[in-house]
Structure formats: structure tokens, C-alpha cells
UniProtKB/Swiss-Prot annotation:
Residues 50-192 form the BAH domain. Gene3D superfamilies: 1.10.8.60, 2.30.30.490, P-loop containing nucleotide triphosphate hydrolases. One of its GO terms (biological process) is mitotic DNA replication checkpoint signaling. ORC is composed of six subunits. It comes from Kluyveromyces lactis (strain ATCC 8585 / CBS 2359 / DSM 70799 / NBRC 1267 / NRRL Y-1140 / WM37) (Yeast). SUPFAM superfamilies: BAH domain, P-loop containing nucleoside triphosphate hydrolases. The record marks E101 as: Histone H4K20me2 binding. This is Origin recognition complex subunit 1. Keywords: ATP-binding, DNA replication, DNA-binding, Magnesium, Metal-binding, Nucleotide-binding, Nucleus. GO terms for molecular function: ATP binding; ATP hydrolysis activity; chromatin binding; DNA replication origin binding; metal ion binding. InterPro entries: AAA+_ATPase (IPR003593), AAA_lid_10 (IPR041083), ATPase_AAA_core (IPR003959), BAH_dom (IPR001025), BAH_sf (IPR043151), ORC1/CDC6 (IPR050311), ORC1_wHTH (IPR048867), P-loop_NTPase (IPR027417).
Length: 886
């Protein structure tokens, strides 16, 4: 299969067709605004005639999996990072269906009679009755690579499959699909597979995905009809093959063509069709309920707004209002029309319909979750409805585990290594010993263990808690939390711990503090509400929804300092929700200020944060040196091919082959290129780590300095290379090939140059060039900020400057400066409090963006705020020789 762009262009061709399969000619002319839009379907055509497009089912062998897996192509994307991406809907096989839940849904009497026998009994029963070639479609999306493609499947509905069995036309590529379900293998629903295939091709990807999610959402159970329950007993009357255990067999099954097998499949299809149709609403009722609700939503009464419900809930709560049509379950009829317009005027045909849809959408955005359920007992199980579409984990790092049906073995986690010692007194020491932190999280093993124990205890017990983490920027706070959550999530995927959801909210990415409600609720439920409705929904969710109907949530409030407001409502609500008994909420707050709760949050919030507080100290120079060496492990002592003409470089692997190059560059002739070896002087790393550890201990700054030093070393080499090329331009350079390896070192001078650049920002350079009066102004401003912790008035700064000069009056240099600034030789007067060129000094700082001023008629009452980092300003002022005497 195609794994590179060159192979793809040889094996595959991209075509665009209409809904009927006719090719659409590419034209450079831009379509006019009034023209009718033509729906395009992207096709991938292989050289042997295989055609892939939305709606086609493919069978793939995913890397790392033992078995084949089936997927329905949902969307073909072009011009992305992988050039062509296939986003597909996942199928489930018979052994992935939750047998107990299936019988509970379709045959309640059989389930109640045998539920004491356990899940294994239902699995064995379903294994003996199921059709091994049947697939179940889910709304879970996965990205599939063309290199994993095995063959294109032939999907049949139940009538076509039954005819094929009767006629003896079965083959290994034929599969039956008549149902959809949740990714967990529960809540089976009728599905016309061919209707859905056409819907994928003719509608927007979001529309078809939402349609599939709607029909698989759990609905409130209807009262069972006893006359129909008796008919359902036929489902378990016939047994299939001699297999009694639901072992995971090969994906392709050889179907027997005997008359007994034909009768068995026919009876199974008919009986299961009756069972499913009795328990689920058919497709026509589903669409009719949506139309009926859309028409009813045009009313502007306040009562209707308060009693708003979704289409699924309306269909459950008020079944008598629907006009139920009697149709055959074999042919589901849907009133949804194709989105391809038949006439040019069809684009503007029904503005009223779109207006009604907008009203429904607007009402839903303002309707809290609490308004949809008057009684908390009516709330369905939200474990499968919520929290299955959003998770703030590194999906790329865990991609294979999510896509693989059965892995060869479990991954080792902290829990699997020390699960017996987690509740002992030495649990923290055991966690530190269990993992090799030096290879991925050096110098943070104690903090990792503390956070792990707090999160593990809350997730395992299903309780709520709050954790406050503080430390200066760049000391590994967020990274440590993410590593802990990744390990816990791996344990949850392997069923070692209860499943939970991880959500990140960054305060710097939110415009207003109240917007965090919208972000939080959208990541929990997948729906977007306004701030007020989201806050009310969150309050209802954590306080009223029973704990058995939801999963634990771990929310990371990163950059907590940015969420602090005057009212403190946002901070209070987040920590207050964690105090509810039904919440199952774990709040991990990360801030840069050590005493933020006591200084800015107040007693009512500080008491709810609790006593679990973990402080991250700055890295020492030994720890910084270890981290730098770890990050530069593959760069130090590495080799490159360097083009003498252009200066472009290609990294060389130990086997002398280029790394991260495409096929054309791999075939390039490097005989005329220079071979360069890069070496980083250990003394240079030592100086960088010691210098940064003495200032802040910020590892990000240390890595940035070393990276910049490598760039300086590269520039020095290129300058030397250009000089040699100019000098030797008239000489024969045929002998300077790859055989002569040159050496370029990153020396102390490169580190020093990078340190000076990183420590002197444009604002710092401006402060260093200020006059003494401007520096004295900033010095007085910073002193007042440290003393008052509030806004500083201009008059207070003048008094502080005067006080500083009076205190240091014995210095002859200060006396001379006082005479120059205030133009007085002996006695001070009130008229002499204004320094010479005062407006110029203040405007100079304002224009540079160093300070911000509030303009009032009375200048002395106007507020002055520092607009840059206080640490950067103090660093520049401390370097001034005159201010060192203060």
C-alpha cells in the first residue's frame, strides 16, 4: 500500500464525481454566487480499479492488531498533513457486543429470568445465536491509513443477505449490517445501511454523524407489551454453531451453504428484526418527531421556552402526540431529502424552515440541562451519552490502543507495578521506585507520586477532591499532571481503574472568566450553551445527577491566576462543585503564585481548596543539566550532510542514511556534500544551567538558550564555509567530499551570546538606556507595588522618589542629582516637588509601553500601572551602578 507521497501518486488517482458517479471537470473559472451548487464526492481510484469514497466499507489490518477490522468511510480529506486522510466510522463484530445489555434491551423477560447466571451465560448464548458475519455500525471516528487497506467489503441489508444465503452466493467479502449501536456495544437500533450510505454521500459529514449519534442515543424504556414479549422468546430458540465460548475469531468467516444453515439464518434474521422493531421507534417516527418539534418551536411563549426538550426526549415523553404511520420495517422511509438542489432557485426555496431551525438552535443554546428533566430519576445513564467524544489527552500518543481491537499484551503502568503497596505507608516511595523518571520526567518523581496518589484515591473511591499546585513558570507543573493522567488513563483503558474523563481549561486562552463555564460544559456533554445556561447545567450535573449515572471528571485549571476576578464567582463555583457528595469531580488547580488562595481568593474559596497543596521549586543546576542532556541526547555527537552551495543540511543516522527525508532526497547524491559533526561542549551546558538556575530555574528558558546557541554555532560554520568557498573558488575542490568529516562545537561564547539575548528583551534594553530620573521613577513604582499590593497613584510615586533621595542624602552624588532634578540648592519647598522635564519622563515610559496611566484632571490622583514583568524591570534596575547604592 502507499506509505509515501511518491507511492500514492503511482498507485492512486483522485477524482471528483457527482452523486450519480459522473466525473466533474476541473475548471479554473470561479462559480458565480447565484449559480446552483453541485455536490462533489471525492473518489480515490486505485490502478486495479478499486474505488474508495464516502459510504464504502473497507477492511483493514491496523498495525499492532491481531485481527482485521471493518470501517465505513465517512469523509475523505485532501491537502492535509497526510495529503489524503480517510476518516471512518468503526464497526463492531459480534463478540464486541455487550450480550447482557442486548438481551436486557430486546428480551427483558429472558434477561430477568437468567440474570443471576452472570454475563458469561449471556455471552455464550449470544455466541451460539449470532451471525458471525454481522457488523454493527457506531458513531466513533478513526483515521485510517491507505497502507492498512486489505479489501473493500460487500455490505448487505438483511433482505439482500437472506437472498444471498438462499441462492448460495455467499463469499468471504460479504457482511450483514442492519443495526447501529454505541461504541461500548450497547443500545442496538435499527439501521437501513444503504439509506445511511446515501446520506453520507449526499449530506455534510457533520449531519450524517449527528444522525447516527441520534439514533443510537439511549432512550427512556417504554412499557413492555406482554403479547409481544412472548414473540421475542423465539430469538433464543435456535442455536447456531457448536461454539459455546465467545472467543475472538478471524474477521472473515466461511458461511455454510446447507439448507439447515439457510433456515437458521432466515429464522434468526426474522426473529431479531421483530425484537428490535418492538423496542425501538422506526425511522419515520424519528424524523416525524423532529419535524413536529421544529414546527412547535416557532411559538414565542415563555412557557414553551422553559419546557424545551430535545427531539429524542419529546418522542419519549409525549408519544401520543406523534402520528405513527404503519410501515414495513424492511424499508425505513425517511422524509429527509437530498441536499442536492434540483433547480437553481432551490437554494432560496424555504427561508421559513431555516428560520425555525435557527429558533430551535437559539433556544437550545439558552436552555440549561436542568430544564430538560423535572425529576432527577428520569435522567438516563450518562456514562455512554456524555464524555465519549471529548477528552483532552494526547490522542496521537495513544492512537494505536484506541484503534486496536485486541493488543498482544497490556502496557505496564504504575498501578500494575505497585497496586498492592498503594494503600500502605510507603506508597510514595514505591511509586518513585516503580518508574524510571530520569528518562522522561527527571527531578519530579516526588511531585509525580504525590499527585498520583491524590488522583488515584479519588478515582478509585468515586469521590471528589481539590489539589492546588503552585510554582514559578517552567518548573514542570503542567507536564507532571499530564504524565500522571496518561498513566491513570492507560490503567483505566486496561480496566485496572474506573474510566474517567480528563479536561483541560487554560486561563490564558479564555477571554472572560465566565467563558470557562461554556468550555467546561461543552467538553463534558458535547453541546454548546451560553455562560449562564452552562453554569446552571454544571450546577445541576454535579449536585443532582446521581453518582451512578456519570463518570469521574478530572479537570485541570491551568494558569489559575488568569481566572481570578473581583467577584470570584468562577473560582468559587469550581471548588464548591468538588464539595458535593454526588459530584465525582477532581479539580487540579495550577498557578504561578504560591500564596494565591490567601492573597486573592478569600477565606470561602481557600477553605474549599483544602489542604492538598503541592509546591514545585525551581530546578537546580544539576537538574537542569540532566534535563538538557536528556533533550539533546540525539543532537549531541550527531552528523549532518551540508550543501556547500546553499547551506541546507540533512541529519545522518548511525547507519549513514538520512533521517526524515522523502524518497527524492533519499536518492540524492551526497558525494559532493560536506559531512559535519556537531558536538556540544559540556562546559557550555554547565554554564547555561548554572546561570538560569541562579535566576529562575526555568527549564523552558534553559532549552531555549541552548537551542539558540546551536543556531549561533550553525551561523558561524556557514560563515566559515562561505569564506572558504570564496578563497578556494579557483581551486579544485573535488576532493572535499563526504570522506572528510568536519567538526563544529557549541562553545561557551555561543551560550553566553544566547544568554544575553534571552535576558535582554526589548523592554529591558529600553530600561537600560533610560536616564537616571526614568529609572528612579520605575524604582519608586516597584517599591510601592510591593508595599501596597494595589494600584499606585502618581502623587505617591513623587513622594516615594523624594523619600528615596532624602534617605540617601549623605551621598554626594545623590545631592548633586537632587539639585539637578529639583533645581534647588538648600531648602525644599512645595513648589519644587515637580522635577524638571517631568512630562517628558512620563510620556517616554508611556510610549514605550513600560507603564500605563489613567488620565484624570488631577494628575496626582491618576493611577500608574506597570505594564511589563516586574522581574525583568528589577533585573535592569539592579544592574544600574547608581541605584545599587539605594
Amino acid at each position: 500500500m502507499a506509505s509515501t507521497l511518491a507511492e500514492f501518486e503511482v498507485q492512486w488517482e483522485i477524482q471528483k464525481t457527482d452523486l450519480k458517479g459522473n466525473l466533474i471537470a476541473e475548471t479554473p473559472r470561479r462559480r458565480r454566487r447565484g449559480d446552483a451548487t453541485e455536490h462533489e464526492v471525492i473518489n480515490l481510484v486505485r490502478y486495479d480499479g478499486v474505488r474508495l469514497y464516502p459510504g464504502v466499507t473497507i477492511v483493514c489490518k491496523v498495525e499492532g492488531a491481531d485481527e482485521l477490522s471493518a470501517y465505513m468511510i465517512h469523509e475523505v480529506r485532501l491537502n492535509t498533513s497526510n495529503y489524503v486522510e480517510l476518516w471512518c466510522l468503526n464497526y463492531l463484530s459480534w463478540y464486541e457486543i455487550n450480550a447482557a445489555e442486548r438481551y436486557k434491551q430486546l428480551d427483558g423477560e429472558f434477561y430477568e429470568t437468567n440474570k443471576e447466571k452472570g454475563d458469561k451465560f449471556f455471552e455464550e448464548t449470544f455466541a451460539s445465536q449470532s451471525i458471525k458475519n454481522e457488523l454493527y455500525l457506531t458513531a466513533e471516528l478513526s483515521e485510517i491509513y491507505l497502507r492498512d487497506l486489505q479489501f473493500v467489503a460487500n455490505i448487505k441489508n438483511e433482505k439482500e443477505y437472506l437472498d444471498s444465503v438462499n441462492e448460495g452466493k455467499m463469499d468471504s467479502n460479504m457482511f450483514l449490517c442492519r443495526s447501529a449501536c454505541l461504541p461500548s456495544g450497547t443500545n442496538l437500533a435499527d439501521l437501513d445501511i444503504h439509506f445511511f450510505e446515501e446520506k453520507i454521500r449526499s449530506s455534510n459529514p457533520k449531519v450524517s454523524l449527528e444522525y447516527l449519534r441520534d439514533i443510537t442515543l439511549p432512550k427512556l424504556p417504554k412499557p413492555l407489551n406482554k403479547s409481544k414479549v412472548h414473540a421475542r422468546e423465539k430469538v433464543v430458540a435456535t442455536k447456531l454453531q457448536s461454539d459455546n465460548t465467545p472467543s475472538k475469531k478471524s474477521f472473515q468467516q466461511t458461511v455454510s451453504k446447507t439448507n439447515a444453515e439457510v433456515q437458521r439464518i432466515a429464522s434468526t434474521i426474522v426473529n431479531e428484526k421483530e425484537a428490535i422493531s418492538d423496542n425501538e421507534s422506526d425511522l419515520s417516527e424519528y424524523h416525524e418527531s423532529k419535524e413536529e418539534f421544529a414546527n412547535a418551536s416557532s411559538s414565542d411563549s415563555d412557557e414553551e421556552f422553559e419546557d424545551y426538550q430535545s427531539a429524542e426526549e419529546l418522542a419519549i415523553v409525549e408519544p401520543a402526540k406523534k402520528k405513527v404511520r404503519s410501515i414495513k420495517p424492511d424499508i425505513p422511509i425517511s422524509p429527509v431529502k437530498s441536499q442536492t438542489p434540483l433547480q437553481p432557485s432551490a437554494v432560496h426555496s424555504s427561508p421559513r424552515k431555516f428560520f425555525k431551525n435557527n429558533i430551535v438552535r437559539a433556544k437550545k443554546a439558552y436552555t440549561p440541562f436542568s430544564k430538560r428533566y423535572k425529576n432527577p430519576k428520569d435522567i438516563p445513564d450518562l456514562n455512554d451519552i456524555f464524555q465519549r467524544h471529548n477528552n483532552d489527552l494526547d490522542i496521537a500518543a495513544l492512537e494505536e490502543r484506541f484503534r486496536t481491537v485486541s493488543a498482544k499484551g497490556k502496557m505496564e503502568t504504575i498501578f500494575s507495578k505497585v497496586k498492592k503497596q498503594l494503600n500502605s505507608r510507603n506508597s510514595k516511595e514505591e511509586i518513585v521506585k516503580a518508574a524510571d523518571f530520569d528518562n522522561y520526567l527527571p527531578a519530579r518523581e516526588n511531585e509525580f507520586a504525590s499527585i498520583y496518589l491524590s488522583l488515584y484515591s479519588a478515582i478509585e473511591a468515586g469521590t471528589s477532591t481539590s489539589i492546588y499546585i503552585a510554582g514559578t513558570p517552567g518548573v514542570g507543573k503542567t507536564l507532571t499532571v499530564r504524565e500522571v493522567v496518561k498513566d491513570l488513563m492507560t490503567s483505566a483503558d486496561q480496566k485496572e481503574l474506573p474510566r474517567f474523563q480528563y479536561i483541560e481549561i487554560n486561563g490564558l486562552k479564555i477571554v472572560k472568566a465566565s467563558d470557562s463555564y461554556e468550555v467546561f460544559w461543552q467538553k463534558i456533554s458535547g453541546e454548546k450553551l451560553t455562560s449562564g445556561a452552562a453554569m446552571e447545567s454544571l450546577e445541576f450535573y454535579f449536585n443532582k445527577v446521581p453518582a451512578t449515572k456519570k463518570r469521574p471528571i478530572v479537570v485541570l485549571l491551568d494558569e489559575l491566576d488568569a481566572l481570578v476576578s473581583k467577584s470570584q464567582d468562577v473560582m468559587y463555583n469550581f471548588f464548591n462543585w468538588a464539595t458535593y457528595s454526588n459530584a465525582k469531580l477532581i479539580v487540579v488547580a495550577v498557578a504561578n503564585t504560591l500564596d494565591l488562595p490567601e492573597r486573592h481568593l478569600g477565606n470561602k474559596i481557600s477553605s474549599r481548596i483544602g489542604f492538598t497543596r503541592i509546591m514545585f521549586t525551581g530546578y537546580t543546576h544539576e537538574e537542569l543539566r540532566t534535563i538538557i542532556n536528556l533533550r539533546l541526547k540525539y543532537l549531541n555527537e550527531s552528523s549532518f550532510y551540508v550543501d556547500p552551495e546553499t547551506g541546507s543540511s540533512y541529519m545522518i543516522s548511525p547507519d549513514s542514511s538520512t533521517i526524515e527525508t522523502d524518497e527524492e532526497e533519499k536518492r540524492k547524491d551526497f558525494s559532493n556534500y560536506k559531512r559535519l559533526k556537531l558536538r556540544i561542549n559540556p562546559d557550555a551546558i554547565e554554564i547555561a544551567s548554572r546561570k538560569i538556575a541562579s535566576v529562575s530555574g526555568d527549564v523552558r528558558r534553559a532549552l531555549k538558550v541552548v537551542k539558540r546557541a546551536v543556531e549561533y554555532a550553525e551561523n558561524d560554520y556557514l560563515k566559515r564555509l562561505r569564506y572558504e568557498r570564496l578563497v578556494n573558488s579557483k581551486k579544485d575542490t573535488s576532493g572535499n567530499g563526504t570522506g572528510n568529516e568536519e567538526l563544529q562545537s557549541v562553545e561557551i561564547k555561543h551560550i553566553t551570546k544566547a544568554l544575553n539575548e534571552s535576558s535582554t528583551s526589548p523592554e529591558q534594553q529600553f530600561i537600560s538606556g533610560l536616564s537616571f530620573s526614568g529609572k528612579l521613577f520605575l524604582y519608586a513604582l516597584i517599591n510601592l507595588i510591593k508595599k501596597k499590593q494595589t494600584d499606585v497613584q502618581l502623587g505617591d510615586i513623587v513622594e516615594e522618589m523624594r523619600l528615596l533621595i532624602d534617605v540617601n542624602g549623605n551621598n554626594k552624588y545623590i545631592l548633586e542629582l537632587k539639585r539637578i532634578l529639583f533645581q534647588n540648592d538648600s531648602v525644599d519647598t512645595k513648589e519644587q516637588l515637580r522635577a524638571v522635564s517631568w512630562d517628558y519622563i512620563l510620556l517616554q515610559l508611556l510610549d514605550a509601553g513600560v507603564v500605563v496611566r489613567q488620565y484624570l484632571k488631577n494628575e496626582r490622583l491618576s493611577t500608574i500601572k506597570l505594564n511589563i514583568s516586574m522581574e525583568d524591570a528589577e533585573q535592569c534596575l539592579h544592574e544600574d551602578e547608581m541605584l545599587k547604592t539605594f
